[in-house]
Each structure stands twice: as C-alpha cells, then as structure tokens.
Amino acid sequence: MRTTKLLIFCIGWTLLFNQCGTDQSKKREDQVIKNTPAKIEENNESQKKSESVGAEDKKVEEKKKDFIVLNDQNAIPFFFQYQKQNKEEKVRISTRFGNIDILLFKNTPYHRANFIYLTKRGYFNNTTFHRVVPGFIIQGGNSDRYETAKKRGEIGKYLLPPDTRKGHKHHRGVISMPSSEIENPYKLASPYEFFIVQQSPGAYHLDGSYTVFGKVIAGMDVVDKINKQRTDNRETPLTNVFMEVSILE
C-alpha cells in the first residue's frame, strides 16, 4: 500500500515538473517571438536612416554640380539664360536698423539677374555695409570674414559690362553697382557689391559711369540711419552693419 502511494506521488511530481518546464519554455518562446519584430523594425529603421543620409549626400553633391564657377567668358551667357527663368524683381535687405525693400529694374537684365542669383546663393548674408559716406552713399556686399571670401571663390571671379544707356539716373534711393578699380578702363561692374544713393536730390555726377539697376521702394529711413553711423578714416562703420538679403517676389 505504502509502495503504491509512493509511486503515485512520484508520478504526480514528474507530471507537474514537466508541465512547469513546458510553461517556462512557452514563455521564453513567446518573448523571443515578440522581440523579433521589434529588432527587425529597429534594423529597418537604421537601414532607412542610412539610405536617407546617403540620399541627402547625393542631393548635396547634385546641387553643387548644378552651379558652374563663373568667369569673364561664361558669366554673360549664363545670366542671359538665368534672367529668362528667374523673373523675381523685389528683394529685402534686413539689418539691425530695419528693412530696405528694393525693386530691381527689368531693363537692366544682367544686373538684375546677377543680384537675384547672388541672393539665392546666400552670398549677401552676413556681409556688411562696409563703406558709409555721410550725405552721399552707403555701400554693401563685402566683409573681411573668411566666409565671404570663400563664397566668392565658389561662385567665381567675373565682371559685368556697364549698362548706363537705359535712362536711369542716380536719384536719391537708387541702387547702383560700383566698378572694379583694378585695371578697368571700361568701368566694368564689380558684381558682389552695390551702393544706395542717400544724397538728396541725387548724385548725378555718377551718371554714365555706374549702372543703376533698382530703387528703394520702402525703408529709406533705414538708409538714412546707416548713413549716420560713425566711421573710421577708411569710411568703414566703427560697428559692423550686417545684412541678410531675401527674395520678396
């Protein structure tokens, strides 16, 4: 009798042990099954990110390839095509003194296209009004920062032919392009800089020598504020007047 009870007891423990083992195995199996999709999803996300970064790198490379380095031989043909496809004519110069809104003239196509192109390339951002002559002009588009020199190197070295026969005079508020002073008997324009006439009613002695290619349509009070800044003996403001230039329309 005792032997029979002992046998039944042993069989019961064996069955219970096997059942527990099965349950534990099932739990472990469930955990592995539940975790697997998460790992796969994580791996997929990692792969997607990697592919996305690769695609972005390709886009940047393609963008760089789209820009040619301009020079005196290809600049005019380039802007001839560019002005056909880029019709924008209003820009905003933002400074700590406020905004200056400018209308670019359509009948000075190369100078308009040049200014729009440089704006879209972000060239003017973080340049300054580096020359201020009280009662005369404010001149901008340059700075002594490495960033500015680097941008010029990437865009190219070129000059623009004067376009002084369109009848635009140097009235107060017009924007005009200075000429390069280095070996430049034909007054070819320096494309990276510009000046705004502050003098009233105008600076007409400049007519015929420099190309007027736009006018201020809002913000002449800002021009007047900048023109009152204290300068050193090189006509450079003692405190930098930085600018950001954006397209309005």
Residues of each region from the PLM?
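Sec-dependent bacterial lipoprotein signal peptides
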Residues: M1-N18
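Cyclophilin-like peptidyl-prolyl cis-trans isomerases
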Residues: C20-E249
